[in-house]
Structure formats: structure tokens, C-alpha cells
């Protein structure tokens, strides 16, 4: 979730089971790990220069620790973290805690999806041509975007935090997503979901890691 939407797609297309990706130098210099012989890098497109070029990242599964390597574990949200995470979400986003953490995820997703629409509605309305959104007025585009984005964000938060979104949502909950059925529309929705999910998950990660440090 720490990569932008277009890079998430490229990582998933090449290595759907990847869990934590970084460039060779990060694993070597920052983490004290080496990329194992025979590993294949995941190609990403770097557009930061005058001309696009490929850069490569490696999943943690492609690496192994050297002597005195820094410990590396993916953060995991457990039941003991929920109270701290709920308090953080209330403080950061002014959403109530009643109904449990999943209900709180939904409220946060609703709020941030609407904020994103307010800031980006001109761009969103500019990509409706040839999609199922074509012909909608602005209010209906807003509702379609908010519902599609909020549901997708909640799904992403639940999945990364160890819940089972497939058992929580019904297929019809995702019907608004299918209105975004052109490459431009998919990109707009995917970028929104990626940016918002990243923001919330980074805050959850910080909260979980702080709780673990306080226990030590």
C-alpha cells in the first residue's frame, strides 16, 4: 500500500503474492539483507526523469539476512491493538467508535472519499466519457464515486488489518465500481482508493508499532 496505484498494479501483475517490496539498495544498505541469486526483480516505470526508464524492486521473499541484519517483520494488527487504533481514528478523523472497528473503518472511508471528491471533482467529472457514468449529472457521479471509493477503501483496510472482507461484503456492494469501466475512470478511482488507504494504513501502522514499543 506504500506504492502509488500504477505501481501497485505492476507489482500485482508480476508478483501477486508480494508482501513488502523495495529496491536493491534499500535491502542491502538499510536492512542488511541481500537479494538471493536467481531472484527476478519486479519492473516499475520511473517517470521522474526526462525519459521513462525501468527500475526494479524485490519482494522480501527474494532476500535473506546478512550477519547483524536489522530485524524485519511486517506489522500485524491484533485484538490487543484495536482500542489504540480506534482511539487514533477518532482523534484523527472525528468518527465515533460505536459499532466496532469495522464500522469505524467505514465511517473513515466515507468521510475521506467525500473529501477527495470535493478536492478532485473537476478531474473526476472529466473522465466520464464512454464509461457507464456518461449521462450522469454531478450529484449522481458524486454518489457513484463516493460509494465505489468508500467500499473499496474499507475492503483494503479490513484486508490489511487481518479481517475477512470477503465474508463481510456482498457482491452487490461493489456494483458502483463497475460504473468506472474505462481506463481513465479505473485510474481515477484506483488512485483515490490507493492514496486514501495508504494514508490511513500508515497511521494504523504507526499506532501498532508504538503500542509494541511501549510493551517492551
Indicate residue ranges for each PLM-predicted region:
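N-terminal accessory/interface modules of nucleic-acid-binding and processing proteins
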Residues: 1-216
